[in-house]
Amino acid sequence: MESQQLSNYPHISHGSACASVTSKEVHTNQDPLDVSASKIQEYDKASTKANSQQTTTPASSAVPENPHHASPQPASVPPPQNGPYPQQCMMTQNQANPSGWSFYGHPSMIPYTPYQMSPMYFPPGPQSQFPQYPSSVGTPLSTPSPESGNTFTDSSSADSDMTSTKKYVRPPPMLTSPNDFPNWVKTYIKFLQNSNLGGIIPTVNGKPVRQITDDELTFLYNTFQIFAPSQFLPTWVKDILSVDYTDIMKILSKSIEKMQSDTQEANDIVTLANLQYNGSTPADAFETKVTNIIDRLNNNGIHINNKVACQLIMRGLSGEYKFLRYTRHRHLNMTVAELFLDIHAIYEEQQGSRNSKPNYRRNPSDEKNDSRSYTNTTKPKVIARNPQKTNNSKSKTARAHNVSTSNNSPSTDNDSISKSTTEPIQLNNKHDLHLGQELTESTVNHTNHSDDELPGHLLLDSGASRTLIRSAHHIHSASSNPGINVVDAQKRNIPINAIGDLQFHFQDNTKTSIKVLHTPNIAYDLLSLNELAAVDITACFTKNVLERSDGTVLAPIVKYGDFYWVSKKYLLPSNISVPTINNVHTSESTRKYPYPFIHRMLAHANAQTIRYSLKNNTITYFNESDVDWSSAIDYQCPDCLIGKSTKHRHIKGSRLKYQNSYEPFQYLHTDIFGPVHNLPNSAPSYFISFTDETTKFRWVYPLHDRREDSILDVFTTILAFIKNQFQASVLVIQMDRGSEYTNRTLHKFLEKNGITPCYTTTADSRAHGVAERLNRTLLDDCRTQLQCSGLPNHLWFSAIEFSTIVRNSLASPKSKKSARQHAGLAGLDISTLLPFGQPVIVNDHNPNSKIHPRGIPGYALHPSRNSYGYIIYLPSLKKTVDTTNYVILQGKESRLDQFNYDALTFDEDLNRLTASYHSFIASNEIQESNDLNIESDHDFQSDIELHPEQPRNVLSKAVSPTDSTPPSTHTEDSKRVSKTNIRAPREVDPNISESNILPSKKRSSTPQISNIESTGSGGMHKLNVPLLAPMSQSNTHESSHASKSKDFRHSDSYSENETNHTNVPISSTGGTNNKTVPQISDQETEKRIIHRSPSIDASPPENNSSHNIVPIKTPTTVSEQNTEESIIADLPLPDLPPESPTEFPDPFKELPPINSHQTNSSLGGIGDSNAYTTINSKKRSLEDNETEIKVSRDTWNTKNMRSLEPPRSKKRIHLIAAVKAVKSIKPIRTTLRYDEAITYNKDIKEKEKYIEAYHKEVNQLLKMNTWDTDKYYDRKEIDPKRVINSMFIFNRKRDGTHKARFVARGDIQHPDTYDSGMQSNTVHHYALMTSLSLALDNNYYITQLDISSAYLYADIKEELYIRPPPHLGMNDKLIRLKKSLYGLKQSGANWYETIKSYLIKQCGMEEVRGWSCVFKNSQVTICLFVDDMILFSKDLNANKKIITTLKKQYDTKIINLGEGDNEIQYDILGLEIKYQRSKYMKLGMEKSLTEKLPKLNVPLNPKGKKLRAPGQPGHYIDQDELEIDEDEYKEKVHEMQKLIGLASYVGYKFRFDLLYYINTLAQHILFPSRQVLDMTYELIQFMWDTRDKQLIWHKNKPTKPDNKLVAISDASYGNQPYYKSQIGNIFLLNGKVIGGKSTKASLTCTSTTEAEIHAVSEAIPLLNNLSHLVQELNKKPIIKGSLTDSRSTISIIKSTNEEKFRNRFFGTKAMRLRDEVSGNNLYVYYIETKKNIADVMTKPLPIKTFKLLTNKWIH
């Protein structure tokens, strides 16, 4: 398109709304956020220059060839008539209109059409009417054509030779979302700048550079309206336009303001993250800068807390300030203000040293007068990693001058820490360090002044054998008179003042010490490289650092002059003054026992108590002087801080008067502690303590319960002990008012022995302080011991006993004696004591064989009470032994190292202390005794039964599924045990080995598939799958025939079920052995096709689904086709839309990708769509998938015996496979106790109703003659085993009535008082559902009855006694039971036998064989559930006759007679049933769920969007370790039990569509992670949203002569952890769903066929039992069928080949299945996967599929 000549009119029109363009981007690196006025001018200049330089000819275009850019259209092309285009394109300037022409009379008049403003539109000629604006000076919107001869001059640029060009401007993109508006504005502003309109863009202050004209405003409005549709504008933009829809300038101004604000925030964050400070600027300025940035960010809503701010500041510190990183990095609560205080202090100290530093520049003549001598004349011997670097130093040595005065100079630490310095740092002179510079390579210069000292540094000397220092400021543990002679290189003596330790604290936060000599008679402080090498520190002159042998950098080395120096800032200062010189020679003192070791040895007692004990010889073997007390004052034991944390101290000295009034052992204090929960049955849950008032001697005894007889046994024992051992009689025992002390049994015992019980008074908390404080102290010690040792919690009483032994031997600060001394006993010999939990090896005197190891790892607990041995805990044997045959395990690790409070190991100290007890290894030194290994006298410690709680500490690795090494061959157990202080696994069952720990995050149940090649044989594939486990030799022969077998699959299965795409058929595991599947001839195939009974050889078309059946056995009486149609006809299968035969759905459309993440399972497999591939050619060993925990003594190693976890939290492994069933679910407690219902009930009306119910229950008990009222028995005359506690419980029934029940405490009933073989039977839910279904089909009347106080009609055979009810006022008496009281173990069985006998003998009923509590006669069927009876009969009079007979013997109430033909509502065993005879029956629980679900504290959303499915595919449960506090864990487990308990109750009643989710979540009850809880909440929410759903049954057609019982089966292969499969079955009677089951397969299946066979085999037994029940209740013939969507399963069942199967588990199930099918006249048919309603039992389904499969039978 040719450009026309422009006239000299002041206005130039343009044919496009986006007029001036350049093909060259302007400032591509320009920040789009920066839109200030200065930048806008730059854009204008750049755009002008670009436009002036670009020329095109009329026949060419400057637009680059780009398919995404629209090219100018010729004039002949008509304009498009469609709307605006969102595509980006290049715009071209059109032919100019006459000068001064403007279509608009006013900017507010916008007569344009949308398509004309489209970026894709280019008008053909000058007649086109477009918005235009006048061109002015400084805004070159266009350029004149060459024909005009005129030149348009721009005042803002010097270019006057502009030629005719065609300019193209890239328009802004279309705005598509309000959230994208900020980014869109940036591109829009850039578009205006490229269009030479930068001057009208508002600046930061909101004003443009120049005024905008009306035409420019119109152009602005039009372009903004086109590219920013109103529906995508933010709210604040719409608010501006609502006031003035043309005020685009205000929108741009506010947008620029927002961009500037965002830019400032980003700059502040970048500045804060890149802070740098080295002291070169004042600290005040640095603080002001940082605080201003933080304040601005906080004001803008970006909160920077103290921790983050301090980390950013410290990261930027360098030079002398860098040291703050290592002193402040542990302060968790440090503030910015505190950090700046340190920075100011260093800065002021630095400035002060600079101002006060004298001039050290030497006169050159001083060098000539220097007559100092050197310590040696050899070259420095430097220990370096690069030996060649050593030669770089000159032949100068460190000098120790024998001068009378020391040349002490002020020292400063100015070196910088550099880990990668490659050249030695050299300084001109020592003054360079005081010029405010860092000691870096930038300050390094070479100098000839090599003999000057570098202040504040130590000279590294390879020739010096000892380290010498002039100042005593850094000497630790200094001692005078060292008796050491030191000479210099000239053999002259150097007097030594003292010897001590020089302690270093290097930059890696490690501490090291070496010996140092103090003398003021040397010129330099010398650091011996030889002594550094002795502590594993070398000088590396390649890197110029001090480092360890492993390469850890400790400190930099500075080269100053000709020598190498290290800074003194790594020295730890000491306040100990060094004595004056004394040359008297004394030998070095012997090594003392470190205080931390003694502190741990003596049960973590405090230093004062230990010193008193050593002074008074209550602890023997060594004296007070043998302990190093230097660290005792400031020493903090982290184990004590954790274990003994307390609120405040108790009042001391409050009981001195009692100590003066009584003799020893006459006044005792006692108290009981407990219970301790979550312990095995063999471990005690309580302990009772006794303390003598005078001597403070303590005793502790374990208790398993607080029964009266247990307490009495302890009192008898301690009184006899005191009487026989101390010849004393106890006069007074002080105790609290607990029931264990106030009971009559103990009171009489004390009265009989002449002992006065002294009880505490009300609100007197101090009166019982002695016993309470002792229990608290022992408990503190217990926690500390368990924390320090890492032993499991079930050994808690051993820690209590160890602490008691030690504390009886420690002196009291007041009495100056120990309790043992007061009692006249000898002091405790500490050489016989071991630290609690000390690892030892115990000799096995009776091994299993001669080659069995003789040593058993164990842990020392405490000295034995009954021998001279020691109680040792043996984790591998789960028991404790009393033995002297042990040796202490040596090593270098310490439990204390994780707290970094001491780097010492105490092996040598422990060896010296217990030297006399280390001799059992040398058998020739001692004589072995036959009784050295004695079982402990404590029953609770022997044969410990570990609690099945989750372990506190877990092993970190699990077996990879691709690991070819069996778990038993792991080499962890082959490591030599040689570590001391090795931690025992906290709460870890010693049976758990590292190889059988369950699921790991890395473990995958999906095998990796490689080299998949299609064979072209109907979807068969060849897979190369890595082995999951080594295959035994016996399997080789079987696998050799793998290639001959086939797995026939149906090709058109529905999306998420088994297809030949999801489960790739493979030759070994996907199908059967070739000898098992019969060969089918062509004739047989043809015959089957003719009879429309397709075989598994050919897949029938999907639209012929009604004939997709394979009958297994054809009875002679019914044709095959009729049987098929009869069974499938009435089933509630989904109606599928018809499909065209020519349309083939994409089989991969809805399949999720196969990846390892699916194996972690959502809800244990939710999200699986059977997209798992079977294993090729070699089978996986079933032993590798066992989830049972096996005993393994070889798992004792150094790894799993350490526990570094804090005591407040536990890590729990996801042991999903350990949960066998939902049996552990605790029901929700709906009953109230007496105090809840009556005593403390604030609801007066409810309280009155409960009182009325209470009296009604008492009257009923008396009426039923429940107990013998003729005689009352004294409690002491009756065997306590036969005494049963009782209580009242209250509840509100569903009908609103209030009920009270007097029950016995059967949970604590002694086993000798009942026959464990008796069974309490109730009607099975399947029997009830079967009876209801038959009642609907046969128009039966349903009558509901209730027998009041049913159990009280049954006599009791055993001799049992109970305490009378409280209202009788006979607490000291017992009454004998005559009737079966509710709560007793035998009451249910007694009632069952009673009512069974009555129904059979008096009512003429008989019990159906195999179905307890189902009785029938010729007219009536009865279902019995405890005291509820459901009667079914076609004649209502027959029911009434039974009722009349029952009323003769029992108090029978008619709940619902069931007469009438209208809809009748029942509440039968929790089911809300609506029944209209001969029409329908609806089963639901809407009222019950509406009442119960809100009480679960689940955040329900009653008005929100309802969930349409209980779960969705693709959700996976993480199986990472769960770290959670113990209390929170118990709370969440209890919450899960409540939620899953209620869901399980509802699911098994009638919501069979939820059973898969319920079963899977039930496996995670002991793993209550946030994800599991959320999924559980989602399930409860779905139950709430669908609480009105009902199980719908319709009456069967009366023309049907037979009853049809069908089981539909399905399996989801390998979608559970550890290759387990989920199986499900749904049972239907006459087309009505009566039950369902979803569970995890007990065996690990290796193919989909095995899983399907497992599912069918699980359904057959129950199908046969139901068949027997139906035939007993209804005499019609019955047809039994089993439907499955697995053709290979049908083929195996049909086959008569009895060759050996692939494995015995698979073969056994298949053979049993064949026998059951053939022997029970059972039909097996194929059902399309799309119609298989059992799919909902095995996997989560999409919403559409879920509704399709369930809406026919539950809605």
Curated annotation (Swiss-Prot):
The gene is TY1B-DR1. This is Transposon Ty1-DR1 Gag-Pol polyprotein. Residues 299-401 are annotated as: RNA-binding. Initially, virus-like particles (VLPs) are composed of the structural unprocessed proteins Gag and Gag-Pol, and also contain the host initiator methionine tRNA (tRNA(i)-Met) which serves as a primer for minus-strand DNA synthesis, and a dimer of genomic Ty RNA. Processing of the polyproteins occurs within the particle and proceeds by an ordered pathway, called maturation. First, the protease (PR) is released by autocatalytic cleavage of the Gag-Pol polyprotein yielding capsid protein p45 and a Pol-p154 precursor protein. Its EC number is 3.4.23.-, 2.7.7.49, 2.7.7.7, 3.1.26.4. Capsid protein (CA) is the structural component of the virus-like particle (VLP), forming the shell that encapsulates the retrotransposons dimeric RNA genome. The particles are assembled from trimer-clustered units and there are holes in the capsid shells that allow for the diffusion of macromolecules. CA also has nucleocapsid-like chaperone activity, promoting primer tRNA(i)-Met annealing to the multipartite primer-binding site (PBS), dimerization of Ty1 RNA and initiation of reverse transcription. The aspartyl protease (PR) mediates the proteolytic cleavages of the Gag and Gag-Pol polyproteins after assembly of the VLP. Residues 1-10, 48-60, 127-152, 1005-1015, 1054-1082, 1101-1111 have a biased composition (Polar residues). Residues 660-835 form the Integrase catalytic domain. Pfam families: rve (PF00665), RVT_2 (PF07727), TYA (PF01021). It catalyses: DNA(n) + a 2'-deoxyribonucleoside 5'-triphosphate = DNA(n+1) + diphosphate; Endonucleolytic cleavage to 5'-phosphomonoester. The capsid protein forms a homotrimer, from which the VLPs are assembled. The protease is a homodimer, whose active site consists of two apposed aspartic acid residues. Residues 1-93, 126-173, 352-421, 956-1087, 1092-1111, 1130-1187 are annotated as: Disordered. It comes from Saccharomyces cerevisiae (strain ATCC 204508 / S288c). The modification Phosphoserine is found at S416. One of its GO terms (cellular component) is cytoplasm. Signal peptide: none annotated. PANTHER family: TRANSPOSASE, PUTATIVE-RELATED (PTHR42648), TRANSPOSON TY4-P GAG-POL POLYPROTEIN (PTHR42648:SF11). It comes from the Eukaryota. PROSITE patterns: ASP_PROTEASE (PS00141), INTEGRASE (PS50994). Retrotransposons are mobile genetic entities that are able to replicate via an RNA intermediate and a reverse transcription step. In contrast to retroviruses, retrotransposons are non-infectious, lack an envelope and remain intracellular. Ty1 retrotransposons belong to the copia elements (pseudoviridae). The keyword Zinc-finger applies. The record marks H401, N402, N582, N583, A1217, A1218 as: Cleavage. InterPro entries: Aspartic_peptidase_AS, DNA/RNA_pol_sf, Integrase_cat-core, Retrotran_Ty1/copia-like, RNaseH-like_sf, RNaseH_sf, RVT_2, TYA. The C-terminal RNA-binding region of CA is sufficient for all its nucleocapsid-like chaperone activities. The keyword Endoplasmic reticulum does not apply. Residues 153-165, 402-418, 960-969 have a biased composition (Low complexity). GO terms for molecular function: aspartic-type endopeptidase activity; ATP binding; DNA binding; DNA-directed DNA polymerase activity; RNA binding; RNA-directed DNA polymerase activity; RNA-DNA hybrid ribonuclease activity; zinc ion binding. Mg(2+) 3 binds at D1610, E1652, D1685.
